[in-house]
UniProtKB/Swiss-Prot annotation:
It comes from Naja atra (Chinese cobra). PROSITE patterns: SNAKE_TOXIN (PS00272). This is Probable weak neurotoxin NNAM2I. The keyword Flavoprotein does not apply. Disulfide bonds join 24-45, 27-32, 38-63, 67-78, 79-84.
């Protein structure tokens, strides 16, 4: 009898939308294992590749409110699901 109220509480907590926070990878290496929790308003994960000189790439990853712009020799990929900026 006591398990029914407990079950209802658990189901209610699981079903409620308690707020969704996006997580994105955030490190300068090619293979990244670190991630960050995005702040309120940041709904985009991005990966920017910048070619500094031939055969030298710099990786920049993180959260953003909008997809970052590009400059010459940059490539930017944006996405909107957890850890999608691999």
């Amino acid at each position: 009898m006591k398990t029914l109220p407990l079950t209802l509480v658990v189901v209610t907590i699981v079903c409620l939308d308690l707020g969704y926070t996006l997580t994105c990878l955030n490190c300068p290496e090619m293979f990244c294992g670190k991630f960050q929790i995005c702040r309120n308003g940041e709904k985009i994960c991005f990966k920017k590749l910048h070619q500094r000189r031939p055969f030298s790439l710099r990786y920049i990853r993180g959260c953003a409110a909008t997809c970052p712009g590009t400059k010459p020799r940059d490539m930017v990929e944006c996405c909107s699901t957890d850890r999608c900026n691999r």
